[in-house]
């Protein structure tokens, strides 16, 4: 059982068969748990659709609605730290609604990319190429598990820090269980909230990790393609026609990678744009909660884990997009420095065509406005400092406590 769950986290032996689909193994397992990948059987599909409706209703409808209703009905009962902790999640939930709906509705794109890019697996023939491929499969699955641990770690820390403080973690509106009536009610309401928020968090995980999974696949196959290009016309036993066929195969594989990048481009543009809009606001609220209001070591840990989770939502994807541009440049450089000088005319014509195509790097943009890069991620994160400066200059924290002490805000 342990081997079944964790075998993809270790690099497979070079003599073992590995496919591109294996790189998204854990991603699709989480998708199956959330109800996003229905089975093929008709009866099972109907039963499974009920679970899909349940998770979608809890994560996309009830979670943001429950937080908003709590502000309307029980706003006077929030402490500043509780309010900011809940508000962070509420704002993130609004972004999660957009990202999750887009990702769920575009799951067909992932299946299409898997079908296309799987045709490149048979190109991994040398030991070096298989080593690159096997390491990538293990690394991508490990990243998905690390994301899952980080996201659920935030939920876990928030749950226990709040319960030990005698409060419900997010104080979702719950007409069935009032956590203020007793110890057992507190635990029941808190566990229910934890389940709802965990589902919403995993839905956001699906929106945040698909780019890492597939861009890593693109990078891996570009690295293998670069190795194949460097070895073109190095075998004296092959004829010029066979060398030409190898060049044509490289051109076709590069075209397949470009086609996959075009498939993922629309969904990546929307989800990363939505994430960029949320990063600065969420980081600003978390920093305000830590800097301007009383906290225990546990609430600080919960806020820090939230900051880590927010940063991991966009930073790895931005970094991979930059590396993908560099990989495209490396492919064109490898082609230019390959052994084509003494080739025949048809081979040189293919080289010129391929060189023209390879010099156009694979780039992605967020909302068709700004490039997806580390620099863009840092730029939107700087908005957090703007929020902190506004709160500091207007002394909002001191005014809040002053109003409470004067009785203007009744708890």
From Swiss-Prot:
Membrane topology according to the record: Multi-pass membrane protein
Any single GO CC term annotated in Swiss-Prot or TrEMBL for this entry: membrane
Tissue expression summary: Expressed in olfactory sensory neurons in the maxillary palp.
Sequence intervals crossing the membrane: 47-67, 87-107, 140-160, 186-206, 272-292, 297-317, 370-390
Assembly and binders: Interacts with Orco. Complexes exist early in the endomembrane system in olfactory sensory neurons (OSNs), coupling these complexes to the conserved ciliary trafficking pathway.
Note: The atypical heteromeric and topological design of the odorant receptors appears to be an insect-specific solution for odor recognition, making the OR/Orco complex an attractive target for the development of highly selective insect repellents to disrupt olfactory-mediated host-seeking behaviors of insect disease vectors. Odor-evoked OR currents are independent of known G-protein-coupled second messenger pathways.
Protein name per UniProt: Putative odorant receptor 59c
Source organism of the structure: Drosophila melanogaster
Record gene name: Or59c
């Amino acid at each position: 059982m342990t081997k079944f769950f964790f075998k993809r986290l270790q690099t497979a032996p070079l003599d073992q068969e590995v496919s591109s689909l294996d790189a998204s193994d854990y991603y699709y397992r989480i998708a199956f748990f959330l109800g996003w990948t229905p089975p093929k059987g008709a009866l099972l599909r109907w039963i499974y659709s009920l679970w899909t409706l349940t998770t979608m209703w809890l994560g996309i409808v009830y979670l943001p609605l429950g937080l908003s209703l709590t502000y309307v009905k029980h706003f006077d009962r929030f402490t500043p730290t509780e309010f900011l902790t809940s508000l962070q999640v509420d704002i993130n939930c609004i972004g999660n609604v957009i990202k999750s709906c887009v990702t769920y509705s575009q799951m067909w794109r992932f299946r299409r990319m898997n079908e296309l890019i799987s045709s490149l697996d048979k190109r991994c023939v040398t030991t070096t190429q298989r080593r690159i491929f096997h390491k990538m499969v293990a690394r991508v699955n490990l990243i998905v598990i690390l994301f899952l641990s980080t996201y659920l770690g935030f939920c876990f820390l928030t749950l226990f820090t709040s319960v030990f403080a005698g409060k419900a973690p997010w104080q979702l509106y719950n007409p069935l269980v009032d956590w203020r009536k007793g110890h057992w009610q507190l635990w029941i309401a808190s566990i229910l909230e934890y389940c709802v928020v965990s589902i919403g968090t995993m839905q956001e995980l699906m929106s945040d990790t698909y780019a890492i999974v597939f861009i890593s696949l693109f990078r891996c196959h570009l690295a293998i393609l670069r190795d194949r290009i460097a070895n073109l016309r190095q075998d004296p036993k092959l004829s010029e026609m066979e060398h030409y066929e190898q060049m044509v195969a490289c051109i076709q594989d590069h075209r397949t990678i470009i086609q996959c990048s075009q498939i993922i481009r629309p969904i990546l543009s929307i989800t990363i744009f939505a994430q960029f809009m949320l990063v600065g606001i969420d980081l600003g609220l978390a920093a305000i909660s830590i800097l301007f209001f009383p906290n225990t070591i546990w609430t600080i840990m919960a806020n820090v884990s939230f900051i880590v989770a927010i940063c991991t939502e966009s930073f790895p994807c931005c970094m991979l997009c930059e590396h993908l541009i560099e990989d495209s440049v490396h492919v064109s450089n490898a082609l230019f420095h390959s052994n084509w000088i003494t080739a025949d005319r048809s081979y040189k014509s293919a080289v010129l065509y391929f060189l023209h195509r390879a010099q156009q790097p694979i780039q992605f943009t967020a909302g068709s406005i700004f490039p997806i890069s580390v620099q863009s991620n840092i730029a939107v994160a700087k908005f957090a400092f703007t929020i902190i400066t506004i709160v500091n200059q207007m002394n909002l924290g001191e005014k809040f406590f002053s109003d409470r002490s004067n009785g203007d805000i009744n708890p």
